[in-house]
């Protein structure tokens, strides 16, 4: 079968299902592909195929994730679904599957459960900006008051973690019904159609990397006689043009400079764009003023910091992580973008030790500044070996 041509005309949005085990995340994922194929002509993906998700490696961590795609009238959605709870934790912390919005699936028959809470907390910690709720298995609940009660509980839970619980859209339905093509009381296909319309309306179109302020992690520094200093790296976001003023942030005091040239594959360009590997020629910057690990940014867009709270996943022994727990006062290296910086870990109140395979919130104090923003990913390393993955939840100073 010929591969379908990827349609670039529709804006692309990344979503995913989250929620407690057996509340119907995978069934809803399959139902979404089915309903969208009938209404909007995208491909159907069967339940079993999603459920036996292939293993992937992200930063050396094994994660099972299923990726499906579907279209609405106005968008192309890429959707991730994970089979196990541990996969969600790893996926969200490593950012292996970035989400512009999440679909929280909660069984109307059971109400919010421990993982419902944990996935909402994780979404808050890793910066998932929007959550839409699908109250599933509503066909099993005869009592309208019970449905209202569950809805209130879910709204309260969202508000607890700083999501707008009162304004969050909640769709009531049955994923299984939709998957079987049924629609009694508009709980099947109609509910899923409504969910897609809600995704369209409630999750704003993400700002593309190229439209964000310029940032390039510096990987290498060269001196070219007669021309000056060139820094190389892959542009993470934005555009850099010749004559743009720039700042060099992190590891030392912030300095300002000007881009006097952009080179790619030994050709001179007027600009470099997000996703491109290039060299940026800097005016008046000496070879020794810059080092790997700093970032080149649009002035004022990113600040250097040393202290932050983070959500961290500690690799298990099987994943090549530590064999033993660590305790408070643990001082590993934190690998941000292109370099390691040593930092001290404070554990939450009442937590004495952290076991391999755990996920935990911690407060980190680095010995040098790093250009950082909420949502920045990092690896935790001991002498070059990755032992954990984390994400900056909140900058303190």
UniProtKB/Swiss-Prot annotation:
Region (G3): 81-84
One GO CC term on file: cytosol
Amino-acid positions noted as binding GTP in the UniProt annotation, renumbered to this chain: 19-26, 81-85, 136-139
G4: annotated segments: 136-139
Chain segments carrying region G5: 174-176
Occurrences of domain tr-type G (ranges): 10-207
Enzyme class: hydrolase
Protein name: Elongation factor Tu-B
Organism: Pseudomonas putida (strain ATCC 47054 / DSM 6125 / CFBP 8728 / NCIMB 11950 / KT2440)
Gene this protein is translated from: tufB
């Amino acid at each position: 079968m010929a591969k379908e041509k990827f349609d670039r005309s529709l804006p692309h949005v990344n979503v995913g299902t989250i929620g407690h085990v057996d509340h119907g995340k995978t069934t809803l994922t399959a139902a979404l592909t089915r309903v969208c194929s009938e209404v909007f002509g995208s491909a159907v993906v069967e339940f079993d195929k999603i459920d036996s998700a292939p293993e992937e490696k992200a930063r050396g961590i094994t994660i099972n994730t299923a990726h499906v795609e579907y279209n609405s009238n106005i968008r192309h959605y890429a959707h991730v679904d994970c089979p196990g709870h541990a996969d969600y934790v790893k996926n969200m912390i490593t950012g292996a599957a970035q989400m512009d919005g999440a679909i929280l699936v909660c069984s109307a028959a059971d109400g919010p459960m421990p993982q419902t809470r944990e996935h909402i907390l994780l979404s808050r910690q890793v910066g998932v900006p929007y959550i839409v709720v699908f109250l599933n298995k509503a066909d099993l609940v005869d009592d309208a008051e019970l449905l209202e009660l569950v809805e209130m509980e879910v709204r309260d839970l969202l508000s607890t973690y700083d999501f707008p619980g009162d304004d969050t859209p909640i769709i009531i339905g049955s994923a299984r019904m939709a998957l079987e093509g049924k629609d009694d009381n508009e709980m099947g296909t109609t509910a899923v159609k409504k969910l897609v319309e809600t995704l369209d309306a409630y999750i704003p179109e993400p700002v593309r990397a190229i439209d964000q302020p310029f940032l390039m992690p510096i990987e290498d520094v060269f001196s070219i006689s007669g021309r000056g200093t060139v820094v190389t790296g892959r542009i993470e976001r934005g555009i850099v043009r010749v004559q743009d003023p720039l700042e060099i942030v992190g590891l030392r005091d912030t300095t300002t400079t000007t881009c006097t040239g952009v080179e790619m594959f030994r050709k001179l360009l007027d600009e470099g764009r997000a996703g491109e590997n290039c060299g940026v020629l800097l005016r008046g910057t000496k070879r020794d003023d810059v080092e790997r690990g700093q970032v080149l940014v649009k002035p004022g867009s990113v600040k250097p910091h040393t202290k932050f709270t983070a959500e961290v996943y500690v690799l298990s022994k099987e994943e090549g992580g530590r064999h033993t727990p660590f305790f408070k006062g643990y001082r590993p290296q934190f690998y941000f973008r292109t370099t390691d910086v040593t930092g001290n870990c404070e554990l939450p109140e009442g937590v004495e030790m952290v076991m391999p395979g755990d996920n935990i919130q911690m407060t980190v104090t680095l010995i040098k500044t790093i250009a950082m923003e909420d949502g920045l990913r990092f690896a935790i390393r001991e002498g070059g070996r990755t032992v954990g993955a984390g994400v900056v939840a909140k900058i303190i100073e």
